[in-house]
Regions:
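A short helix-coil junction within the Rossmann-fold of NAD(P)-dependent oxidoreductases
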Residues: 27-36
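Conserved mid-core segment of classical short-chain dehydrogenase/reductases
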Residues: 1-11, 54-57
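Residue(s) in the substrate-gating loop at a strand-loop-helix junction
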Residues: 45
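Active-site loop-to-helix junction immediately N-terminal to the catalytic Tyr of the SDR YXXXK motif
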Residues: 51-59, 71
Length: 173
């Protein structure tokens, strides 16, 4: 998706990646508070921390999902509500499979898979460990933490580097 994507595609990304978490929290948090606490694990993406080449609506909505998770954690921690955000990079699912008849996946999938496609069973083990440790951010690929450090250390350099990668993936550089 890009700037020319229909509004309906942007709305779908927003509804699935942000509003689903809002609706779940509206329903669950009051009940958790009544019980004396609880735990939410929301799924975002490494794109929510780093962004998504070739996927403006996806990357934007995944950033918003992390922002909402942060808000939940900051607002309800004192009431016994824990929050974790799962931020996987490339996991082998139907969503990351190449389109029917295509030799390669999408631009976004190819970029994300550069650090290796993870099997769902590996993801499950990482999630169980992250929840046991009550980590806010649960990363599936350790490289993402280093990418986050690079991004926050020098945003301008990060953006220039990502633009070079984008052009290379498009075959322009």
């Amino acid at each position: 998706m890009d700037l020319q994507s229909p509004n309906a595609e942007w709305q779908l990304s927003w509804d699935v990646n942000v509003m689903a978490h809002v609706f779940a929290a509206r329903h669950l948090v009051p009940r958790m508070i009544e019980r004396g606490g609880g735990y939410l694990m929301n799924t975002s993406s490494a794109a929510g921390l780093l962004n998504q080449l070739g996927g403006a609506a996806y990357g934007t909505s995944k950033h918003a999902a992390i922002g909402f998770g942060e808000w939940l954690a900051m607002t309800y921690k004192h009431q016994g509500i824990g929050v974790s955000m799962l931020c996987p990079q490339a996991v082998r699912t139907a969503m990351t499979a190449p389109p029917p008849g295509a030799d390669e996946g999408s631009l976004a999938t190819n970029a994300a898979a550069g650090d290796g496609m993870m099997e769902p069973e590996e993801l499950a083990e990482i999630v169980v460990e992250g929840l046991a440790e009550e980590r806010f951010i649960i990363l599936t690929h350790p490289e993402v933490l280093e990418y986050m450090r690079r991004k926050t250390n020098d945003y301008d350099r990060w953006i220039a580097g990502m633009n070079r990668l984008y052009r290379r993936l498009l075959g322009e550089a």
